[in-house]
């Protein structure tokens, strides 16, 4: 599945539009809370384990996006937008949401 943040795919022609599709993934409360605690503890550094968790959530959201587009008969998604949103009681969860337009390209 081709996915791009641009409204078109260079060298390809969009033959049909199938509608807006989305994918989401949520990182649970403990992971998000621990992530900030770890960042405070390693000022100026990076936390590989938390970056890996966030990367995994983003990949899950993109997999959901591709599946949604595929169910509509699309072979690409254009205009992809990636958002991160803090949710829940005491802002204890992080949602990664991706959306775009499912299309068929040649």
Curated annotation (Swiss-Prot):
Q: Which organism is it from?
A: Aromatoleum aromaticum (strain DSM 19018 / LMG 30748 / EbN1)
Coiled coil where? none
Q: Domain of life of the organism in this record?
A: Bacteria
Q: Which Gene3D superfamilies match?
A: Hypothetical protein apc22750. Chain B
Name the UniProt record assigns to this protein: UPF0145 protein AZOSEA16190
Q: Which family does it belong to?
A: Belongs to the UPF0145 family.
Q: Name the InterPro entries for this protein.
A: UPF0145_dom_sf, UPF0145_YbjQ-like
> PANTHER family under this entry?
UPF0145 PROTEIN YBJQ
What NCBIfam families is this protein classified in? PRK02877.1
Q: Name one Pfam family in it.
A: YbjQ_1
């Amino acid at each position: 599945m081709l996915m791009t943040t641009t409204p078109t795919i260079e060298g390809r022609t969009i033959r049909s539009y199938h509608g807006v599709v989305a994918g989401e993934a949520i990182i649970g409360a403990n992971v998000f809370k621990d992530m900030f605690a770890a960042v405070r503890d390693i000022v100026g550094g990076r936390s590989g384990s938390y970056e890996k968790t966030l990367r995994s959530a983003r990949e899950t959201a993109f997999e959901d996006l591709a599946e949604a587009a595929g169910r509509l008969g699309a072979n690409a998604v254009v205009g992809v937008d990636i958002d991160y949103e803090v949710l829940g009681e005491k802002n204890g969860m992080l949602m990664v949401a991706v959306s775009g337009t499912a299309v068929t390209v040649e």
